[in-house]
Amino acid sequence: SSVGLEEAKLIASTNLCDAFGRTGIGGRKENQDNYTGMSVGNNVILTVCDGMGGMNGGQTASRIAVTEIAQTLAEFPIEELGENAIYKAVDAANAAIYRRALNDPPLRGMGTTATVLVLTPEAAYLTHVGDSRIYQLRKGKKEFRTFDHSKVFEMVAQNMMTEEQARQSSFSNIITRALGIRPKVDMVVEKIPYKKGDRFILCCDGIWNTLPEPEMMKLFLAKSATKEEVEYLTETVNGIGEQRGGDHDNLTAIVVDVKQKSTYQYGCLKLAGLAIKRQLARLGKGNGKSRNVKRS
């Protein structure tokens, strides 16, 4: 169903990739999601944020985040777009939301998730805060996925529940990291290779929490055009939400189709090191800080 969904938009198109985004209010009174995409030379910058907080706080937080991240990254020289640039951009967004909340009492406690993907000819650089996700698909199969900063996914990492149990848990809306809640935010920027024909998906929990991941992956088995794919994904999720009573969450997704191979590729030792690093990250071995934030 396309009820409550905005039109799918072409948000970036270069020799590297094409990216379309779409958002919808779902069954809520306001849409607290925001997304953005932009081209800087041949590079592409993409962000999806899912806000939280009453009195327009969630909307405000996610809007500040996508704006601040894009503006900060756009100020970097093209050759410097990478890990350091993303750290600085997300830090700037976190500080801007935190300051705004301090200066505007009705907005106190507002925050937002964030996913950031920067595609350069060398590699894909990405980070996430909270439970919005980035997927990398290759030939219809999952090549990579971010691991949610949430209470239930801490339990998944400790083998206390499966991912499907986590998805259906009544505690699935409690996240352990968000932008704007503290003066500083803990994050990890990853550098991963990509190949021609790969597809990246950035999405909020309103997308992935509606249907099991295997069902979501099936939607991408038929290699449709980028715009058709983001339309199909959002309309499928929206339709399921309507069938379940129509009080479903906001839903936002960006679909990216890659047109060439990155110059950076993994070696065997690098892959082994990454596997260990990811497992540590999943267990929360960042700076040891964790704070539960309940989302509406």
State the predicted function of each range.
Residues 1-296:
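PP2C/PPM-type serine/threonine phosphatase catalytic domain
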